[in-house]
From Swiss-Prot:
Name of the protein this chain belongs to: Uncharacterized protein YHR022C
One GO term of the biological process aspect: intracellular protein transport
Taxonomic lineage from the root: Eukaryota, Fungi, Dikarya, Ascomycota, Saccharomycotina
Annotated GO MF terms: ATP binding; GTP binding; GTPase activity
Annotated source species: Saccharomyces cerevisiae (strain ATCC 204508 / S288c)
GO cellular component, one term: endomembrane system
Domain of life of the organism encoding this protein: Eukaryota
């Protein structure tokens, strides 16, 4: 039986959208889909090949991010005016950052957070690295984990077709909780092990079709191709997730 942790926050506390000092990211996906390596790469740990036979439990990590880092991340791509080639889809999804999600970032970092930025200088980012979810039923613990999340990263292994297919079940469960709790929790899809070109079984075209059918778009920073081993797009992935959290919280505050 697998053991899964929760963030430990009380659901009776203030709504997550009013927490301006922390962001909670849950990383989900099949076992051995590269979740742990992705998280540890972002935390600055050295890359290690996972032992497929090793039993593991869910882990909760912390990392402090300066709020200015998010502002600089936005301004970098705003000034360049180009969407980074995160997914190998640049030719099909070319355009400026303003064309694809300009209002999305502009409102968040310039308008919505103008006063917020003056009150805080850093964000405590809590990353919850889960083990494989039981998709056959929705447990109370799984519901709690999703409800406590500010955003969810769904990982699949570019060399394992079944890990991509599993995402549909994960997304259905997350959407169910989102509707039930009336929460707009951002979901970002991450393809791991993109450095293993010779072993890759999932083509860019297949990924694009799959994520578009589920309502996701690389142009909206919904999808990233990553390599934990060579630290490809890892930092960009997590910064984009944090930007999405800022917007989600801002939108939620306006409704309350």
């Amino acid at each position: 039986m697998s053991v899964r942790l929760s963030y430990g926050a009380s659901l009776a506390s203030i709504p997550r959208c009013f927490d301006l000092k922390s962001s909670k990211i849950t990383v989900m996906g099949d076992d051995h889909s590269g979740k742990t390596s992705l998280v540890r790469s972002w935390l600055g740990s050295s890359f290690q090949i996972s032992d497929a036979n090793r039993y593991r439990v869910s882990d909760l990590y912390h990392k402090t991010i300066q709020f200015d880092t998010l502002v600089k991340y936005y301004r970098t791509f705003g000034v360049k005016g180009q969407l980074p080639n995160y997914a190998g889809f640049k030719a099909k999804n070319s355009g400026t950052i303003y064309e694809s999600c300009g209002n999305f970032l502009e409102e968040r970092l310039i308008n919505a957070n103008k006063s917020t930025a003056q009150r805080r200088t850093s964000i405590d980012v809590q990353v919850f690295d889960t083990n494989q979810m039981e998709v056959s039923y929705l447990s109370e613990l799984t519901t709690l984990q999703i409800r406590q999340s500010d955003a969810i990263i769904l990982c699949f292994d570019s060399t394992n077709d079944s890990s991509l297919a599993s995402l549909e079940s994960y997304i259905c469960i997350i959407h169910h909780v989102r509707l039930e709790c009336e929460l707009d929790i951002p979901i970002i899809i991450a393809c791991t092990k993109c450095d293993l070109d010779s072993e890759r079984t999932i083509t860019h075209e297949k990924v694009l079709t799959f994520i578009q059918e589920l309502g996701f778009s690389p142009g909206n920073l919904d999808y990233f191709e990553t390599s934990s081993k060579f630290n490809v797009n890892v930092e960009d992935l997590f910064l984009a997730v944090l930007l999405k959290i800022e917007k989600s919280k801002s939108d939620r505050r306006k409704l309350l």
